Amino acid sequence: MTLAARLKQEFVSGWKPFEVVWLALFIIAQIWAYVQTPDSWLAMISGISGILCVVLVSKGKISNYFFGLIFAYTYFYVAWGSNFLGEMNTVLYVYLPSQFIGYFMWKANMQNSDGGESVIAKALTVKGWMTLIVVTTVGTLLFVQALQAAGGSSTGLDGLTTIITVAAQILMILRYREQWLLWIGLNILSIFLWAETPAIYLMYSAYLLNSLYGYYNWTKLVKRTN
């Protein structure tokens, strides 16, 4: 298959009209937020690339990792400017490496879907849920203490969102549907964390809506796999 054919399959095939409108509205909203409050062009780029990334993830498209890489680089500097140490460490040690690891993990587990390709999705077992809850709780308590010792801002909320992000990112790489439940919780918390940065605040609001759709769509992918 030629490069042009692969790009067409990835970005044109398998899209529903409302998904295209959904994505366009999110991007327009990001640009509007920057025009209204031009606080940081990096925040705008981070917001747009982040929205492209999560919408592609919700559809199970492997191209999400390209936009995820752009998001990771720009978001790091935005978090740095806000002194959110937990978010900075998340980008450096979770988001960046996971873009490369996730790409190769997904590449080996793709299937034809609605004229395009989508990832083969899985669902957590009861044992998996128990492990997730214990590890997330203990990890949050330990990381919040570390952030307080380092003098970070909003350490409780910052620490909680960081650990949830790590857990959700791992579930995403491993292709588990339940990542979306964590993303829903994370996006609600992040809306409060970034309340004073309009572009990022709006980005997480868009993420919240997309994560609801992502859970719905991945439930269909799990059923298709089974």
UniProtKB/Swiss-Prot annotation:
Q: According to its record, how does it sit in the membrane?
A: Multi-pass membrane protein
Q: Pfam families this protein is in?
A: NMN_transporter
**Under what conditions is it induced?**
Repressed by NadR.
Q: Where in the cell is it found?
A: Cell inner membrane
Free-text function comment from the UniProt entry: Required for nicotinamide riboside transport across the inner membrane.
Family statement: Belongs to the nicotinamide ribonucleoside (NR) uptake permease (TC 4.B.1) family.
User: By what name is this protein known?
Assistant: Nicotinamide riboside transporter PnuC
Organism for this UniProt entry: Haemophilus influenzae (strain ATCC 51907 / DSM 11121 / KW20 / Rd)
